[in-house]
């Protein structure tokens, strides 16, 4: 263990630290895929610090989501203050100078987007190791970010992610194509040998793939390694649409169902994006029709139900994280909270890195009782253990994204039981999304132990199932 590390690692974290060291000693990379909240960042910091104390002179490059750049620098300062750390941000000219001087630091940290823009400069450097945090950012091998990441020069490469597979096996291939190109073959051969057979549950393909990747993937879940983590209680709260809201929902549902029914499978595939946009409209009506109809004046059953949960939690002395994938819904909730004199913070993709850090500090210090967060902007990387109530206002296609958001509160450092409320509009597409999440978990479980569905994988029959059977 590095002498200057300012932390005491738990047993499983020591195992992870030693695993990283063993891989690097062999010149190999790997995926640290621990459950959210188990300290992947700390394990990697300990590994980097150990290499520096052993005489490593080349820098480490950490690439992470923009919202986590300052989180990484803060954690490095906290746990390894002896390391020289530089955040590569700011204007292009400033970044160019910082990258050219990367070897003056032990660790340099930047975001995926800036790494993509600056890849030509990074390609001229020589890093001891490259670490991709939230490595699902390169899950699509066709993106510019994925292409750029695979050009980064390094002795070894590591990936940190709680969800190495969110929706399909090709995501795992893309991460391994970054770590150790060729290990899983070409993308085409991987699809033929593993992806298609596993997704269709053919033969022993899942077991063979697990055998192939298991030496390079370390995944622990909280239930297995943290005996003292407080309980997590999950509760689905149904809201019954009534009146004008229900009329709008049924009218739109029937219209979309007729459109899909009259499309052939080939037409559906071509128009899938349009259909998914229509499904989003249905989901917005479930949340609050004002998301789609500016002149809508009637109420929202879900918003009323949500406010009942908020008041009940606050009356009990609890503190709340409230997630929605729709920033417009967070705006509507903000107005309702302000009207009822409830103090709150709001984090979206428009929030600056500095304001994110400030809001997290305020919430953790107990200054504000409610934190509204967009699922995409704040679902990963944040430590918000001051909350013991989590409300998911709307269900996302990929349940893993919701689980990641929940684990902002249910993680190491949490002292209280965490209650998670999933708000669902009864007899609507939302209820069927939940059912589909449950029915499509098996794919990832068979390889790594995870879950998720993808709207991109929807068939015509899936969409009709989402639209069909709604009670009237």
Segments from the language model and where they lie:
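ASCE P-loop NTPase motor core, strongest for the SF2 helicase catalytic module
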Residues: 1-202, 210-472
